[in-house]
């Protein structure tokens, strides 16, 4: 649920904001250049006028309010699992990934917590109706499991397909040709996914869903980073509506969670219930975007 508020800046700046706001002596020196000194009051005033200060404060209040309201329901094991999944996905590049996205390890884990807390709040406030579930059922597809070989050129992908046509093993070709270092050593197998999964290009998902068990793509699939060859491992039948209530409900929640209008209203309600208020007149508008239809008054 990646649309939820990004808290990467939190670690970089929020400590200073909190520290300065709670100081008993605003004239305490924080820095010096030449014979000039910068007091805490001067620094706080400058920080207060920065556009990012409102974003930082909003992130702090939202995270804090959600944690206060739903922290006891947070699955910490799932947060840790998600964090480790990112670490595994990026491998030796994980630290670079964090730096490029303005995260520390702590703030990145907070972002994951924030996503889970927001989803908990969403489920508390909204429930899919039977008609919504039936509408979701029309386009529902079960999760599938595939192997893939990721290449940077169409020619390489065509070479792979030709070798598959000649009876060579998909797993051995994945090991030899796939540029996906995370899956090339395990036959190119990917975790089960569905059409709602945003990790994969739509062309990849559409190409995969056309396959029956043990079939592979006869033409390279064009994706953002090159060309894919896909083999179907498990393509379950759709089943029946009565047995798929849980999956349909989760699919609807995932769609709602990616809708900024819906999530702003959800967060607005949490802020209202937690009696969030901003005392500083210069930062008063930090939560304006969440006042919306719930008419919250911060």
Curated annotation (Swiss-Prot):
The UniProt record lists the keyword Isomerase: yes
Record-linked InterPro entries: Foldase_PrsA, PPIase_dom_sf, PPIase_PpiC, PrsA_foldase, Trigger_fact/SurA_dom_sf
GO molecular function, one term: peptidyl-prolyl cis-trans isomerase activity
Any one of the GO BP annotations: protein folding
Keyword tags: Cell membrane, Isomerase, Lipoprotein, Membrane, Palmitate, Rotamase, Signal
Reactions mediated catalytically: [protein]-peptidylproline (omega=180) = [protein]-peptidylproline (omega=0)
Family statement: Belongs to the PrsA family.
Biological role stated in the UniProt entry: Plays a major role in protein secretion by helping the post-translocational extracellular folding of several secreted proteins.
The name this protein goes by in its record: Foldase protein PrsA 2
Organism (species): Lactobacillus johnsonii (strain CNCM I-12250 / La1 / NCC 533)
Biological classification of the source: Bacteria, Bacillati, Bacillota, Bacilli, Lactobacillales
Primary gene name: prsA2
